[in-house]
Design a protein with these regions (language model features):
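Bacterial signal peptide processing site
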Residues: 22-25
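C-terminal motif of bacterial Sec signal peptides marking the signal peptidase cleavage site
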Residues: 17-20
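Bacterial N-terminal signal peptides that target proteins for export
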Residues: 1-9
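Thiol/disulfide oxidoreductase modules built on the thioredoxin-like
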Residues: 127-132, 140-186
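Hydrophobic beta-strand anchors of alpha/beta hydrolase catalytic cores
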Residues: 79-80, 110, 156
């Protein structure tokens, strides 16, 4: 009798373990309409005004403790990379993501959005993966993850220059990221 009870529990734990860092789910379509949309507000920055899409109207703190305003991303395509420090898929994406950030510097934004752990582990991940050339938000409470309806790490949300989601999904090893950004900057 004990085996009948124990077996389903073991199978459940095993299946959750196999899921690991999340699925390889891929959605080339924009996120649902309840996520940040194209609604815009005018923000004054440096004396000028810029249209700030609703999607970019958020604030946070970087893993280095500096304030971050999503409005600073307005006007350029933006890659939001949602990762967790303990995630092997995220580590595999790090080099390609850093390469894209360098390749498209000044043409597109790349921002890491770290979650599902503490800030010390997040800083260690950035140091260990060599991804410190672009900003990483410390989203310990999941505010930015929820805003973009991200439910698992190792996902990318790519916004066009108008703040519209043009891609949301997993790119194993970051493969294909450069092509997606090139299509928005060319």
């Amino acid at each position: 009798m004990r085996t009948r009870t124990l077996l389903p529990a073991v199978l459940t734990v095993a299946s959750l373990t196999l899921v690991g860092c999340g699925g390889d789910g891929d959605s080339g379509a924009p996120a649902s309409t309840s996520s940040p949309s194209s609604a815009k507000a005018t923000a004054s920055e440096g004396g000028g005004s810029a249209e700030v899409p609703e999607a970019l109207r958020f604030t946070g703190t970087t893993v280095d403790g500096k304030p971050f305003d999503g409005a600073s991303l307005a006007g350029r395509p933006t890659v939001l990379w949602f990762w967790a420090p303990w995630c092997p898929k995220c580590r595999a994406q790090a080099a390609e993501t850093a390469k894209v950030a360098e390749e498209y510097a000044g043409k597109a934004n790349v921002v890491g959005v770290a979650g599902l752990d503490g800030n010390d582990a997040m800083r260690d991940f950035v140091d260990q993966t060599g991804t410190g050339s672009f900003p990483h938000l410390s989203d310990e409470d999941g505010t930015v993850w929820k805003r973009f309806e991200v439910t698992e790490q190792s996902r990318y949300v790519i916004l066009d220059k108008d703040g519209e989601t043009v891609y949301e999904g997993v790119l194993p090893g970051g493969e294909g990221l450069s092509g997606k950004v090139a299509g928005l900057t060319g």
